[in-house]
A protein has these predicted regions:
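Mid-chain, well-packed structural core segment of small domains
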Residues: 60-98
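Non-catalytic interface/targeting segments
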Residues: 1-60, 64, 71, 97-125
């Protein structure tokens, strides 16, 4: 399974998850094996404008990061908060959006494997 998690750092499985997808400096793409163990972790730039856009240029840049994420082909995105535009874009691409318990990538993967997930709803500020 390919699981995307927004993070505050690039410290492998011990990377701390970012509380908000749109403000995360990094995105960790975690590949798990059939038993749910972490097989690999790859990090990508996650900085993108927040979903509350002031101009068409900002909206275009947001679509760009959404396209980059979609191109990574994650099966699931695990986040605590995500704006309505991102929820709409990723859901339309068939990506499952959930929140899970845990502070680090490894803790979140354990929660996903244990089924301790909930459907992610759009965050509105």
């Amino acid at each position: 399974m390919r699981i995307l998690i927004p993070t505050l750092s690039r410290n492998g499985a011990e990377s701390v998850a970012s509380p908000h997808f749109g403000r995360a400096p990094y995105l960790a793409l975690v590949e798990t094996d059939l038993k749910g163990n972490i097989a690999s972790i790859e990090f990508f730039a996650g900085e993108g404008p927040h979903e509350d856009h002031r101009s068409e240029k900002d909206a275009t840049e947001a679509r760009s990061i959404h396209s980059r994420v979609t191109d990574l082909k994650p099966d699931v995105i695990v986040a605590s908060m995500m704006g309505p535009r991102a929820v709409s874009d990723f859901s339309a691409s068939g990506i499952k959006l959930v929140s899970a318990q845990g502070r680090t990538v490894s803790e979140i993967i354990s929660s996903v494997n244990s089924g301790l997930i909930t459907k992610l709803e759009p965050h509105r500020e």
